[in-house]
From Swiss-Prot:
Induction context: Expression is controlled by the fumagillin biosynthesis cluster regulator fumR. Expression is also under the control of the developmental and secondary metabolism regulator veA.
Protein's job: Beta-trans-bergamotene synthase; part of the gene cluster that mediates the biosynthesis of fumagillin, a meroterpenoid that has numerous biological activities including irreversible inhibition of human type 2 methionine aminopeptidase (METAP2). Within the pathway, the membrane-bound fumagillin beta-trans-bergamotene synthase af520 converts farnesyl pyrophosphate (FPP) to beta-trans-bergamotene. The pathway begins with the conversion of FPP to beta-trans-bergamotene by af520.
Species: Aspergillus fumigatus (strain ATCC MYA-4609 / CBS 101355 / FGSC A1100 / Af293)
Upper lineage: Eukaryota, Fungi, Dikarya, Ascomycota, Pezizomycotina
Disruption phenotype: Completely abolishes the production of fumagillin and decreases virulence.
Catalytic activity line of the entry: (2E,6E)-farnesyl diphosphate = (+)-exo-beta-bergamotene + diphosphate
InterPro entries: Prenyltransferase_related, UbiA_prenyltransferase, UbiA_sf
Name of a matching Pfam family: UbiA
Name of the protein in its database record: Fumagillin beta-trans-bergamotene synthase af520
Practical and industrial applications: Fumagillin and its derivatives have been intensely studied for their potential use in the treatment of amebiasis, microsporidiosis and rheumatoid arthritis. They have also interesting antiangiogenic properties by the irreversible inhibition of human type 2 methionine aminopeptidase (METAP2).
Family statement drawn from the similarity comment of this UniProt entry: Belongs to the paxB family.
Record gene name: af520
Transmembrane segments: 35-55, 95-115, 142-162, 165-185, 222-242, 262-282
Length: 289
């Protein structure tokens, strides 16, 4: 009986392991990309939403598993709850999992007609994880932005019944890429100790803390103003969006502690989520096809 119960727990344990691989990217990758897809696509069925979510998570997990295989030492300091440093899975098992996920990712691409998106994404994650470009701060942000853009691109296509992006929909996804390319280093403030241990050269380590934080604040404020002007949300939504931006920036500017930076990064995720759902207002006004 105990053996049967133990076997019954394996699927739950495996799902928890997958969740722990992607947990830290839920605020800044999963939620924003799902939100923007729901906003940009025409109203869709629950079946398409589940299909898009699984495609989204399959692509995210493929990147995260390989990235965490290469970053065990770093994660043992900054994120000990992750599957590899906590011992839930061995490096060998994780490598096998990565290969299976990569294969399934391409099966999903063929099945959902998102081959172009998955091709761009595959090139991006390979050059990021295996090409050594993650060590170059500006390139790291750009590739991260391309990855986020691909999550939005592919998920939107699935939600929209296979239609390719065009017009304001394409503009919205390009805005997401631009936002993350210029502000994505917000995630690196919380990992300074681990990044320094691993020898990574992130923007928060290359620049002084005041310069790194105030430049992030300036860019984020500029995007906030620009997106409000572009998408023209109602006044109450504008106030809420600005409030999220100010809370995020106040956190980064008022404390340099990495624990506080983790909280500020969560607020950054909410601000990014807000940035991604603002195109709903052109849709409500009938400006999106």
């Amino acid at each position: 009986m105990d053996r049967v119960l133990s076997l019954g727990k394996l699927p739950i344990s495996f799902l928890k392991t997958l969740y722990l691989f992607s947990k830290s990217d839920i605020p800044a990758a999963t939620l924003p990309s799902m939100a923007v897809a729901l906003v940009l696509a025409a109203p869709c069925s629950f079946h398409l939403i589940i299909k898009g979510f699984l495609w989204n998570q399959l692509h995210l997990l493929t990147f995260q598993v390989k990235n965490q295989i290469d970053g065990i030492d770093e994660d043992s300091i900054a994120k000990p709850h992750r599957p590899l440093p906590s011992g839930r899975i061995t490096p060998g098992q994780a490598t096998l999992l990565y290969r299976v996920l990569f294969f399934l990712m391409w099966v999903a691409a063929v099945y959902t007609n998102t081959i172009s998106c998955t091709l761009v994404y595959s090139i991006a994650i390979v050059v990021y994880n295996e090409g050594g470009l993650a060590a170059i701060p500006v390139v790291k942000n750009l590739i991260g932005a391309i990855g986020l853009g691909c999550y939005c691109w592919g998920t939107t296509i699935i939600f929209d019944g296979g239609k390719e992006l065009h017009g304001l929909k394409a503009v919205a996804v390009l805005m997401i890429v631009g936002i993350f390319a210029t502000t994505g280093h917000a995630q690196d403030f919380r990992d300074r100790t681990a990044d320094a241990t691993r020898g990574r050269k992130t923007i928060p380590l290359l620049l002084s803390q005041p310069v790194a934080r105030w430049s992030l604040a300036t860019i984020t404020a500029a995007w906030t103003i620009g997106l409000i002007a572009l998408w023209k949300p109602p006044a109450i939504v504008t106030l809420a969006y600005v409030a999220a931006s100010l809370r995020c920036l106040d956190g980064f500017l008022s404390s340099y502690d990495e624990k506080d930076d983790y909280v500020s990064y969560c607020w950054y995720g909410f601000w990014l989520l807000g940035s991604n759902i603002l195109p709903i207002f052109p849709r409500l006004r009938g400006e999106l096809p």
